[in-house]
Amino acid sequence: MNQTNMENRIVRYGDLEPCRTAFIDAHTPGSNQKENFTIIGGGVSESPDQYVHISDQIGFNIGAAGQPPRCRNSLHSHRTAEVFFVLKGWWRFFWGRWGDAGEVTLEEGDIFNIPTGIFRGFENIGSDYGMLMAILGGNDAGGGVLWAPQVIQDAAEHGLVLAETGRLYDKKNGEVM
């Protein structure tokens, strides 16, 4: 492999391109400021606006979430294991159908493996912008995201609807299913 081909496999931190409309909770207050990064593999974004840095299918996906303080990622699940690596900040992870089955606080350098099929969410509880790396198994990133029913209901109240195909429709922008 030549130098140019190898350099095409590098994603530099300063070149990361966020998507602020990646998921069904993009308009829900408290979750509407998060940024999603799809770094390697197709990821699980529900938005056609998501930029994929390296689209190779290599058996797993690497993504990231960037969030300002007090911004949360809504309760969701995946069909494959998900591992989080805290890159920056302080984070509260919570789990269960309503997010009240348990919680843990993590800091920079901590790694957390969340079992398949458990609803989980997370919130930046630090005072600065925080970032997590997420690793999902499988080329299809587990077939997408499975949202807790209350997340889908909250999103609909704020204009976002998720089709059975996994595509996100924004009624505020006049999109119809």
Where are these regions (language model features)?
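A short, N-terminal "cap"/entry segment at the start of jelly-roll beta-barrel domains
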Residues: 1-59, 164-177
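Histidine-centered metal-chelating micro-motifs
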Residues: 71-74, 92, 111-112, 116-121
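Conserved short histidine dyad/triad with adjacent acidic residue
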Residues: 44-49, 61-78
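Double-stranded beta-helix
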Residues: 2-9, 121-177
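Glycine- and acidic-residue-biased ligand/ion/polar-headgroup-sensing regions
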Residues: 79-92, 96-97
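Short histidine-centered beta-strand/loop micro-motifs
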Residues: 50-55, 72-78, 95, 103-105, ...
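Short acidic-glycine-tyrosine-enriched beta hairpin
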Residues: 97-116
